Amino acid sequence: YNLTGEDFLLELGHLLHRQSFSFIDMVDRGDLRRPCTIHCVNLAQGIKEPIIYYQQDTDRKYIDAVKEGFRDIRRFHGQPQGMYGGDEALHGNNPTQGSELCSAVELMYSLEKMVEITGDIDFADHLERIAFNALPAQISDDFMTKQYFQQPNQVMVTRHRRNFDQDHEGTDLAFGTLTGYPCCFSNMHQGWPKFTQHLWYATPDNGIAAIVYSPSEVTANVGDNVPVVISEDTYYPMDHQITFTIKEVRNKVKQVKFPFHL
C-alpha cells in the first residue's frame, strides 16, 4: 500500500490481521515464558506482525506487545548472541540449546522492519547483536556450507546427538550443505543483503539517518531535494569510531555544439 496507495490492500491487511495467529494474545497468555509453545522460525518471522499492522492501526498496544514479547524471550530463552534457545521448538536458555540459522536471518529481517517503522534504537541494537555475532558464525565464507543449529557454549562442531528438541541424526552442529535440515541452505543468503538495505533510513524532515552502522555508501536527495553521497567508514563494532564523508553532487552543465565532429 505504501507503494501503490490501493485501498483494497488495507482491507486485505485488516482481514489477514483479524484471521491470522495473534502474537499479542500469545504474549498475553505468557506463551513465550514456556518451552515448546511455538516453532523458532515462526516466532522470528511472525513477531513483527503487530508492528507491521501498527502502520494501519496506530494503537500503541502493538508496539508494547512486541517489546514485552522480547523481554520474555530474553529472560526465559535468551542467548548472548541475540538469539534464543529454539532447536525447532522454543527451548529455554540453557547454553547447550541450539539456535537455528533460519531464525537468525528471519529475526534480522523482522527487526529491520521494526526499526523502519518505529525508529526504536532498542530494535536496532538487537539487530546488530545478531548480525555481528550469530550470523557470521553459522555460514562459511564461501556460502557453500552452513550450520543448522548454533550453541552459545559450542565446544565441538561434530556429528553427535545432543539435547535438542529435534536431532537430525546428530548432524545439526556439523557444517555442510544438507546437514541438519536443508531449509537454512536456501534461506541463509538473505541475511547480509537485507541488512545492507536497512542501514540507512529516511527521516520525516527530508533527511537521512544512519541507525545501523556498517561500512557503506548511500546516494540520496535530502533537504530541498539536494543530491548527496554519504560514505561511512568504520570497523564497528570492533571500534566505535565512525567517519561519515558527505559530498554534494553538483550537476555540471555542458555546452554541446551541433553537428558533432568526432
For every predicted segment, state its role.
Residues Y1-H261:
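Glycan-recognition and catalytic cores of secretory/periplasmic carbohydrate-active enzymes
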